[in-house]
Amino acid sequence: MLGLGHDVVDVPAFAKQLNEPGTRMRNLFSMREIWQTAQRSQLKHDDEAVHLAARWAGKEAFLKAWCAAISRHAKDGAEVAYPYTLDNFPWVRIEILDDSHGVPRVILSSEVQRKVQQSLGLPLDPVCQSYDISISISHDGPIASAVVMLEI
């Protein structure tokens, strides 16, 4: 295991932030994520915010798993250099999408995939990803949660 991340989202607070006038929260999701959550919301007869909150937890959990992996990879006493800050993290380029069986997956843009490989000292191979990303997302009542594990 390279890194493990977990995040919990308060769904009502997230929904309030998502619906505030002038908010940019929706810009942190790809069009595919927004489309999928709208479809899932219709199918489940519930609020779209529930499904977006779970995906937001997934993005946060991925970031935490990646940071944990970078910290573990650093040499003893070495300064840890993270590729992004919270201000320039490319949230929209980390997608949490369901596959054809409804199983959530983390989909990284090629730029983010390259940064992950570089930051962890993994081979740069655009065709064959040298690591796996496992994700589990859930929501129950007012809470959405996600766990992400990076592994070789």
From Swiss-Prot:
One GO cellular component from the entry? cytoplasm
Name the InterPro entries for this protein. 4-PPantetheinyl_Trfase_dom, 4-PPantetheinyl_Trfase_dom_sf, ACPS, Ppantetheine-prot_Trfase_dom
Question: A GO molecular function for this record?
Answer: holo-[acyl-carrier-protein] synthase activity
- Which reaction is this enzyme known to catalyze? apo-[ACP] + CoA = holo-[ACP] + adenosine 3',5'-bisphosphate + H(+)
Taxonomically, which superkingdom? Bacteria
UniProt cross-references to Pfam families, sorted A to Z: ACPS
Q: Does the keyword ATP-binding apply?
A: no
Its needed co-factors are:
Mg(2+)
The residues that hold Mg(2+) are D7, E60
The catalytic activity of this protein is classed by the Enzyme Commission as 2.7.8.7
Q: Where would you find this protein in the cell?
A: Cytoplasm
What processes in GO biological process is this protein linked to?
fatty acid biosynthetic process
Q: Which UniProt keywords apply?
A: Cytoplasm, Fatty acid biosynthesis, Fatty acid metabolism, Lipid biosynthesis, Lipid metabolism, Magnesium, Metal-binding, Transferase
Chain's role? Transfers the 4'-phosphopantetheine moiety from coenzyme A to a Ser of acyl-carrier-protein.
Similarity comment text for this entry: Belongs to the P-Pant transferase superfamily. AcpS family.
- What name has this protein been given in UniProt? Holo-[acyl-carrier-protein] synthase
User: From which organism does this entry originate?
Assistant: Bifidobacterium adolescentis (strain ATCC 15703 / DSM 20083 / NCTC 11814 / E194a)
Gene symbol? acpS
